[in-house]
Amino acid sequence: MILEHVLVLSAYLFLIGLYGLITSRNMVRALMCLELILNAVNMNFVTFSDFFDNSQLKGDIFCIFVIAIAAAEAAIGLAIVSSIYRNRKSTRINQSTLLNK
């Protein structure tokens, strides 16, 4: 694939995730948009690693590291969301003041 096509696709994914993160009022949707942003960044890592240096796997290894961190972030985020839902019966961001106290 041409480098520009992949970068444009990655930019679209990043912007969709950023728009969803800014406008979403649901915590689960915000976590999904954050994962979309991280996947767009991973796509850039793999693309630049393949385009600039085929012999080394630094971009691919860093991508795997980011995927592992994103999985841990998603698990912790969903645990926090389920705890807030159990206590408040809502997953709306603007109604949750549990962390302010």
From Swiss-Prot:
Single GO biological process annotation from the record: photosynthesis, light reaction
A Pfam family it matches: Oxidored_q2
GO cellular component term, pick one: NADH dehydrogenase complex
GO molecular function: oxidoreductase activity, acting on NAD(P)H, quinone or similar compound as acceptor; quinone binding
InterPro entries linked: NADH_UbQ_OxRdtase_chain4L/K, NUOK/Mnh_C1-like
Record field: transmembrane: 2-22, 32-52, 61-81
Predominant location: plastid
Keywords from the named record: Chloroplast, Membrane, NAD, NADP, Plastid, Plastoquinone, Quinone, Thylakoid, Translocase, Transmembrane, Transmembrane helix, Transport
Reactions mediated catalytically: a plastoquinone + NADH + (n+1) H(+)(in) = a plastoquinol + NAD(+) + n H(+)(out); a plastoquinone + NADPH + (n+1) H(+)(in) = a plastoquinol + NADP(+) + n H(+)(out)
EC number(s) recorded for this UniProt protein: 7.1.1.-
Gene3D superfamilies in alphabetical order: 1.10.287.3510
Localization of this protein: Plastid, Chloroplast thylakoid membrane
Keyword Magnesium: no
Membrane topology (UniProt): Multi-pass membrane protein
Top EC class, one word: translocase
Family stated for the protein in its record: Belongs to the complex I subunit 4L family.
Subunit-structure text: NDH is composed of at least 16 different subunits, 5 of which are encoded in the nucleus.
Function as written in the Swiss-Prot or TrEMBL entry: NDH shuttles electrons from NAD(P)H:plastoquinone, via FMN and iron-sulfur (Fe-S) centers, to quinones in the photosynthetic chain and possibly in a chloroplast respiratory chain. The immediate electron acceptor for the enzyme in this species is believed to be plastoquinone. Couples the redox reaction to proton translocation, and thus conserves the redox energy in a proton gradient.
NCBIfam families associated with the record: PRK05715.1-2 (NF004320), PRK05715.1-4 (NF004322)
Protein name: NAD(P)H-quinone oxidoreductase subunit 4L, chloroplastic
